[in-house]
Design a protein with these regions (language model features):
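Terminal leader/tail segments of proteins
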Residues: 1-119
């Protein structure tokens, strides 16, 4: 299990290195097109067939798109993450989720929430 986490982390690091560096103000257009990007402490990337937007890393996913549905983290941590949410909102309907459920969706999909998987 530890090796898998290490490989995933290394793979994500390489994907982020290839993603275009953008300003946060332009991030929404990347989110709407579901394209990878790297902003200032703001990331958008594909993982396991899901498009994930994170603020300050994997512990705080803002938005996740899976199978035609957008999920939105409704928890607030800082003014900056709230600003990131505003800058990246896809301007489509979203289903509100807790941060814990968003991490489960990010790693296992919505089915992980349905079966009660832990973070």
């Amino acid at each position: 299990m530890v090796q898998r986490i290490t490989n995933v982390t290394a793979r994500q690091h390489m994907q982020r290195k290839r993603a275009p560096r953008i300003t946060n103000v332009t991030a929404r257009q990347y989110v709407q097109q579901k394209e990878s990007f790297q902003g200032n402490n703001l990331f958008g990337e594909w993982r396991y067939g899901r498009y994930v937007v994170t603020s300050y890393g994997d512990h705080f996913p803002l938005f996740i798109w899976e199978n035609g549905t957008w999920y939105e983290n409704i928890e607030k941590i800082t003014m900056t993450t709230s600003k990131h949410r505003t800058q990246t909102h896809p301007h489509e309907d979203t289903l509100p989720m807790t941060c814990k459920d968003m991490v489960v969706i990010m790693n296992h999909g919505i089915v992980g929430v349905a079966v009660g998987m832990a973070v």
